[in-house]
Curated annotation (Swiss-Prot):
This is Methionine--tRNA ligase. Pfam families: Anticodon_1, tRNA-synt_1g, tRNA_bind. The keyword Metal-binding applies. Binds 1 zinc ion per subunit. The gene is metG. SUPFAM superfamilies: Anticodon-binding domain of a subclass of class I aminoacyl-tRNA synthetases (SSF47323), Methionyl-tRNA synthetase (MetRS), Zn-domain (SSF57770), Nucleic acid-binding proteins (SSF50249), Nucleotidylyl transferase (SSF52374). Zn(2+) binds at C142, C145, C155, C158. Its EC number is 6.1.1.10. It comes from Magnetococcus marinus (strain ATCC BAA-1437 / JCM 17883 / MC-1). GO terms for biological process: methionyl-tRNA aminoacylation. PANTHER family: METHIONINE--TRNA LIGASE, METHIONINE--TRNA LIGASE, CYTOPLASMIC. It catalyses: tRNA(Met) + L-methionine + ATP = L-methionyl-tRNA(Met) + AMP + diphosphate.
């Protein structure tokens, strides 16, 4: 039996859980539930990330202590996760004695190993607020890509990390005043000491290929010292040999994975060392967002290695959530938090929809609300629940709830379902949830075809067909039960209801798909899932929009400039001259996956894209003038639309073998077109 420890990134105790966060927690929870369903020893650890200046300042603003604030947020987060059936084996806090002791141990062992350096630095200081400004309380322009309104430690657009003093046009995020530079003694982790070790670790299969490639870029730039200290006042752990200095939150936050495990082990009588002080007793997996890759795949394994702890077996990164093809937006009502969603809709709708779109890659996931309604209604209500709702009533009313004592002839369907289980299990294991859902729905289609072919509603009208009616319904319900076992990691609540329907003496396990139920008495069928109502989705969006703050009025000059810009663009947006159908059909539009993207040296607007057009058409190189709106990293793995038969064009930087389609007036307002989920590279757009 495998022993598996799984973590999700720790939610910060300064805000609500929203649908973007839930991508990761639902993805992780599905993976954990799958392993438990298979009989593996798998524990899921998480905690609130509680330290840092934002917590301290918010608590001051609300007139409470930081401890009171994080305790309040802990309760709220736990309730939100429970509402979406995210089931942690331990949900703890980084503001714990276990975390303090482990953080100190990691620091002291690295210090004693010569991996800590003390240096005097120039640091941003707000004279108005009389405090050194932490990274996240400085906003400005990224020194690498020029993106505006970025944090003082890392850029959300290009993922670069830097020191706050490197930020251009910096301002205090609290009061808006321009900070001054002031010297301060800080403690640095010598990351470059672990360069060789990290290169080997990264290439050992611990990361997805695209993430390993991204890390290679940072090695090419050279690893830098990492500032692990912050000046007081600060809510966090004081550094043992440095009064008035505190551990930076990114040192004690990942240590929270270990502290939560330790807390859990003490409660359960389990050996903590088997998980974190040796690597031959258990597997350790981290699920994270791609925006925190740097911390989890460079700093974290280096700190662990330097202090004698084991490193993760693998780190799985996922992309961001978009809604209707765009970033979550409060003004559009698509920045939806967990409580807003659950007030209107069944959380298992979202669990299934995310599962139906999640892959093992680092692709962004789009929550298309129209597709959401259609897919949930079609797949779960129309294909899965429909099997039980059409047949269970006949068994209860006509046969006192009893399935056939001997499983009937079913043309090999049950065996086919059982054999498909290994393929589905392999897809779950590899985090190819979308493919797993597709495989399950193909089975559901087969089961529904069986029902259509044998028409139990017709058999019920003929007294001479009573035995055949029981047989058809028994087969259908057994197929339904198998489908629900396959779906149990995704739909735990509905699976529990189905267990009650079948009078299951124990919760379903994966091995239950091996044999059909015979002679079992089932309970009366109870409604399992309603259709998604578009009206409720619209009401949810409207409620989220109403809670969004009113837009800040623009100065008259800015408004005038915007009007002039819109007027100039009107001519560009005028309808082009008509063409006939045959002319249009000469344009060969294809689905393409952006396999790679990088900046073009010497070009201000261009990105070089490597497009995958499937096995037949292979790859193409295309230069696209979209650099002002997208970083190269944002594009990797995305699907787009390309004009595939455009004649190659020789450019200064190389030959462009096509054109990707985009909308927008230009500048920073460019949006590449993406096909809906399910489209495959190379498919022609008609």
């Amino acid at each position: 039996m495998r022993r598996i420890l799984v973590t999700s990134a720790l939610p910060y105790a300064n805000g609500h859980i929203h649908l973007g966060h839930l991508v990761e927690y639902i993805q992780t929870d599905i993976w954990v539930r799958f392993h438990k369903l298979r009989g593996e020893e798998c524990i899921y650890m998480c905690a609130d990330d509680t330290h840092g200046t934002p917590i301290m300042l918010r608590a001051q603003k609300e007139g409470i202590t930081p401890e009171q604030l994080v305790n309040q947020m802990h309760k709220e987060h736990a309730q939100d996760f429970a509402a979406f059936f995210v089931q942690f084996d331990e949900y703890y806090t980084t503001n714990s004695e276990e975390n303090r002791l482990l953080s100190e141990e990691i620091y002291l062992k690295n210090r004693d190993g010569g991996h800590i350096e003390v240096d005097t630095i120039q640091q941003a200081y707000c004279e108005h607020d009389a405090m050194f400004l932490p990274d996240r309380f400085i906003r400005g322009t990224c020194p690498h890509c020029g993106a505006v309104d970025q944090y003082g430690d890392s850029c959300e657009v290009c993922s670069a990390t830097y020191r706050p003093t490197e930020l251009k046009e910096a301002k205090c995020a609290v009061c808006g005043s321009q900070p001054v530079e002031k010297s301060s003694e800080h403690y640095f982790f010598k990351l470059q000491d672990f360069s060789d070790y990290l290169k080997e670790w990264i290439q050992s299969g611990t990361l997805q290929p695209e993430m390993a490639a991204k890390l290679n870029e940072w090695f090419e730039q050279g690893l830098k010292h990492w500032d692990i200290s912050r000046d007081g006042p600060y809510f966090g752990f004081e550094i043992p040999d440095a009064p008035g200095k505190y551990f930076y939150v990114w040192l004690d936050a990942p240590t929270g994975y270990m502290a939560t495990t330790w807390h859990h082990c003490k409660k359960q009588g389990i050996n903590f060392d088997d998980y974190w002080r040796r690597d031959d007793k258990a597997e350790v997996y981290h699920f994270i967002g791609k925006d925190i890759l740097y911390f989890h795949t460079l700093f974290w394994p280096a700190m662990l290695h330097g202090s004698g702890f084991r490193t993760p077996t693998a780190v799985f990164a996922h992309g961001f959530l978009t809604v209707n093809g765009q970033k979550m937006s409060k003004s559009r009502g698509t920045f939806i938090n967990a409580r807003q969603y659950s007030a209107f809709l069944n959380p298992e709708y979202l669990r299934y929809y995310y599962a139906a779109k999640l892959t093992s890659r680092v692709d962004d996931l789009d929550l298309n609300l129209d597709d959401f309604v259609q897919r949930v209604n079609s797949d779960l209500v129309g294909k899965v629940v429909n099997l039980a709702s059409r047949t269970a009533g006949f068994i209860v009313k006509r046969f006192e709830g009893q399935l056939c004592a001997d499983y009937p002839e079913d043309d090999g369907l049950f065996q086919q379902f059982h054999q498909a289980g290994e393929e589905i299990a392999a897809l779950y294991e590899k985090r190819e949830f979308a493919k797993a859902m597709q495989a399950i729905m193909r089975l559901a289609d087969s089961a529904n075809q069986y029902v259509e072919n044998h028409a139990p509603w017709v058999l019920a009208k003929d007294p001479l067909q009573s035995q055949r009616l029981q047989q058809v319904c028994s087969v259908t319900l057994n197929l339904f039960r198998t489908l629900m076992i396959f779906l149990k990691p995704v739909l735990p609540y509905m699976s529990n209801q189905v267990e009650q329907l079948f009078n299951a003496p124990q919760p379903f396990v994966w091995q239950d798909t091996a044999a059909p139920l015979q002679g079992v008495t089932i309970n009366a069928f109870k409604h399992l899932m309603s259709r998604v109502e578009k009206e409720k989705v619209d009401a949810m969006v409207e409620a989220a929009r109403e809670e969004a703050p009113s837009p800040t009025p623009q100065p008259k000059q800015q408004t005038k400039e915007k009007e002039e810009k819109n007027k100039k663009s009107a001519d560009k947006d005028a309808l082009a001259a008509s063409i006939d159908f045959d002319t249009f059909m000469q344009v060969d539009l294809r689905v393409a996956r952006i396999a790679d993207a990088h900046e073009v040296e010497g070009a201000d607007k261009l990105l070089q894209l490597t497009l995958d057009l499937g096995e037949t058409l292979g790859t193409r190189t295309v230069f696209a003038g979209i650099k002002s709106s997208y970083s190269a990293e944002q594009l990797k793995g995305r699907l787009t639309v390309v004009v595939a038969n455009l004649a190659p064009r020789k450019m200064k930087f190389g030959i462009s073998e096509g054109m990707v389609l985009a909308a927008g007036p230009g500048g920073t307002d460019i949006h590449i077109l993406s096909p809906d989920s399910g489209a495959q590279p190379g498919q022609r757009i008609k």
